[in-house]
């Protein structure tokens, strides 16, 4: 668990006391500042969205000594988890089935290929090159391949990872995923400057199939326009929804370290693995699809879209600010060099190898 999660558990979970309310007010105020700044001309010129500015502001606050007195662990966890998931669900109001259909089969095949390649290479590189335990290598690979910290926390029980291994894997996701927020818009601008014809939706699939966290995907794709952002979210949801079957596969292929029942009971192990996968299922992804279905059927009036978008952006900005406060560079470096190096190699593989997979699938699809 991260430091914030440990503090949150020690404090008894979510308690709306005076400090919590003050922290929520500060969180909302900083997110509001990021939203206002993100709407200015200079931010648009620099390609900085409200979400990018929110995480930058959070990173700045996170390095201020004593900020935990106001931003409690409960406040951070509420923003990182509850508000983030609610924001992802509301994002469905921006999507329609027609947009999903327009991505075609490649929009599903690409993220699944990237996921499989990252899991396999991550487990091999982590154990053979960097000497990590099998459980830690799988954790780092899952965080990079599926959906960031949520995947790490879901996979940890399946491989019986220690709290330290879990915390290090989450730290790597935060570090390289945050770097990706700034890298992908720059890569898109570089491609445009070089005269490479890349459709925004195709680049959105590239972002969604290779970047770690859901919030990071949205933040990286937003500056590129609605087509890129929507495609990125749909592509990312394919990876998120793959978490449940991945947990079953991991539990069944790692019996020595994973979810084991009675000795020799393969059927019992499978039942337990399936139960864990069901409990760890990212239901917010299903919620996003449900809202997208409502929007496709015209159940969401056009006059509601603007306020829903504003509320959604506010929730996501709060989540990005909270994630930023946890991106404390000295703390990340103390978490361990070898796991971070492994995560760095996987990140390079996602950026370069993911681009090759995206290009290859689209070439084969004609």
UniProtKB/Swiss-Prot annotation:
Pfam families: Cons_hypoth698. GO terms for cellular component: plasma membrane. The chain crosses the membrane at residues 21-43, 103-125, 137-159, 169-191, 198-220, 240-262, 283-305, 343-365. It is a multi-pass membrane protein. The keyword rRNA-binding does not apply. Disulfide bonds: none annotated. It is found in: Cell membrane. Keywords: Cell membrane, Membrane, Transmembrane, Transmembrane helix. Belongs to the UPF0324 family. NCBIfam families: YeiH family putative sulfate export transporter (TIGR00698). PANTHER family: INNER MEMBRANE PROTEIN YEIH-RELATED, UPF0324 INNER MEMBRANE PROTEIN YEIH. This is UPF0324 membrane protein RSc1111. The lineage of its organism: Bacteria, Pseudomonadati, Pseudomonadota, Betaproteobacteria, Burkholderiales.
């Amino acid at each position: 668990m991260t430091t914030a999660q440990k503090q949150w558990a020690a404090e008894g979970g979510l308690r709306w006391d005076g400090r919590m309310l003050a922290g929520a007010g500060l969180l909302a105020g900083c997110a509001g500042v990021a939203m206002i700044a993100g709407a200015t001309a200079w931010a648009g010129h620099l390609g900085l969205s409200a979400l990018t500015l929110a995480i930058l502001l959070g990173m700045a606050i996170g390095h201020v000594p004593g900020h935990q007195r106001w931003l409690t662990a409960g406040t951070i966890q509420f923003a990182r988890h509850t508000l983030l998931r609610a924001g992802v669900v509301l994002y469905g109001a921006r999507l329609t089935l027609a947009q999903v259909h327009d991505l075609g089969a490649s929009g599903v095949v690409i993220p699944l290929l990237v996921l499989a390649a990252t899991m396999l290479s991550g487990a091999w590189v982590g154990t053979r090159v960097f000497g990590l335990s099998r459980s830690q290598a799988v954790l780092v690979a899952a965080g990079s391949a599926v959906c960031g910290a949520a995947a790490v926390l879901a996979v940890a029980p399946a491989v019986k990872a220690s709290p330290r291994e879990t915390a290090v894997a989450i730290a790597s996701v935060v570090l390289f995923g945050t770097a990706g927020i700034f890298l992908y818009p720059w890569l898109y601008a570089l491609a445009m400057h070089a005269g490479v014809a890349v459709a925004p939706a195709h680049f959105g699939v590239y972002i969604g199939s290779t970047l770690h966290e859901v919030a990071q995907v949205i933040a990286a794709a937003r500056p590129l326009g609605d087509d890129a952002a929507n495609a990125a979210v749909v592509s990312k949801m394919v990876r998120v929804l793959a978490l449940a079957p991945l947990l079953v596969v991991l539990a069944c292929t790692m019996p020595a370290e994973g979810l084991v029942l009675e000795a020799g009971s393969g059927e019992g192990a499978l039942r337990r693995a399936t139960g864990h996968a069901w409990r760890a299922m990212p239901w917010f992804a299903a919620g996003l699809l449900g809202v997208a279905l409502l929007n496709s059927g015209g159940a969401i009036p056009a006059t509601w879209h603007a306020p829903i978008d504003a509320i959604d952006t506010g929730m996501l900005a709060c989540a990005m600010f909270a994630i930023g406060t946890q991106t404390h560079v000295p703390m990340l470096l103390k978490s361990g060099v070898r796991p971070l190096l492994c995560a760095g190699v996987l990140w390079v593989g996602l950026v370069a190898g993911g681009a090759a997979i995206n290009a290859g699938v689209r070439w084969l699809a004609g």
